[in-house]
Amino acid sequence: MSPSTPWKPTGNPAAPLEDRPVGIVLAGGASRRFGRDKAALSVERGGAAETLAERALRRLSEVCADVVVADAGRCVVPGARSLADGPGRGPAAGLLGAAGAFPARSLLVLACDLPAVPAALLALLVKVAADGGADLALPRWREGAEPLAALYGEKALAALGRRVASGKYSLHDLAEEPDLRVAFLSEIDLRPFGPPEEIFVNVNTPEDLALWLARNEAG
């Protein structure tokens, strides 16, 4: 997919629409450490170019029928729906903007700067949440939980809204809310997808990008 090619969804889930999660690409960050907009950064895939935002959107579209981009209304992916931020700041603002656009729907979230997260892992998050009736499902490994590749149910999003209203913007602490049912993917669950430090490589700097690209070429 080239940056100029409008995106089209490919997912075809069998569940009723209202029961399916909406795929949310988080792409609203300021990219201060990178020095330019990461979401619009073009990388090679199989000889073709795609942006990091397009890559995340493609992965989510393998799992979700509805996929949109929470990019503070910047329209970083041609043809994809662009969402304005909600209240708060950082990823929480993107999540709450999406929650406002899709009330009563769960959200399957993937940040554009997590380019190595596979669609199969995202699908596992959906399954684990559905099987256990979880309000929040996310991976957890020795470096901690990863809230930017996670499934947020309606109750978790409501809790996030209350936290943001009280000035708490971090997603990392949301799982500690006592009224939420939280499901974690353990390192054993993650093992089929590769080493966690490679799955969750975060492209914050040009050096991070170079490392991820080198790993891709090696693999």
Question: What annotation goes with each model-predicted range?
Answer:
Residues 2-4:
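Serine residues within intrinsically disordered or low-complexity segments
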Residues 204:
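Active-site rim beta-loop-alpha module in soluble metabolic enzymes
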Residues 207:
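Conserved active-site and cofactor/substrate-binding residues in soluble primary-metabolism enzymes
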